Every structure is written in structure tokens, then in C-alpha cells.
Amino acid sequence: MAVQQNKKSPSKRGMHRSHDFLRTTPLSVDPGTGEVHLRHHISPNGYYRGKKVIKTKED
């Protein structure tokens, strides 16, 4: 089993753990339709930045 050579101080321990938190997914609302989608992704109805970019089954 590995044994530490030097004790990690509380400050260094905190710095090590500083990135362990969970991040929320960045959501955006399409201004034209009001659909919620991931930022920089096409909304479920085929719109990106207010323009229709792909055809969907409903079209």
C-alpha cells in the first residue's frame, strides 16, 4: 500500500478539491419558438440562432 511522504496541508487539500463540484448544463431559450436547448446546439425543432437549418419530421 502506498504511504504519503509529506502531509498535505488543509490549504493544498482545498485547492485539490476545488474542481470536484458538479456543473449545471448551460441551457438557452430560442427567442423565436421559446424552446429550451443546449447552447451552441440545434433546438429540437431544427432551429439554430433563429434560422431553420434542418428539416424535421413535422415539416
Curated annotation (Swiss-Prot):
The keyword Ribosomal protein applies. Keywords: Ribonucleoprotein, Ribosomal protein. GO terms for biological process: translation. One of its GO terms (cellular component) is large ribosomal subunit. SUPFAM superfamilies: Zn-binding ribosomal proteins (SSF57829). Signal peptide: none annotated. The keyword RNA-binding does not apply. It comes from the Bacteria. One of its GO terms (molecular function) is structural constituent of ribosome. Residues 1-40 are annotated as: Disordered. InterPro entries: Ribosomal_bL32 (IPR002677), Ribosomal_bL32_bact (IPR044957), Ribosomal_zn-bd (IPR011332). PANTHER family: 50S RIBOSOMAL PROTEIN L32, LARGE RIBOSOMAL SUBUNIT PROTEIN BL32. Belongs to the bacterial ribosomal protein bL32 family. This is Large ribosomal subunit protein bL32. The lineage of its organism: Bacteria, Pseudomonadati, Pseudomonadota, Betaproteobacteria, Nitrosomonadales.
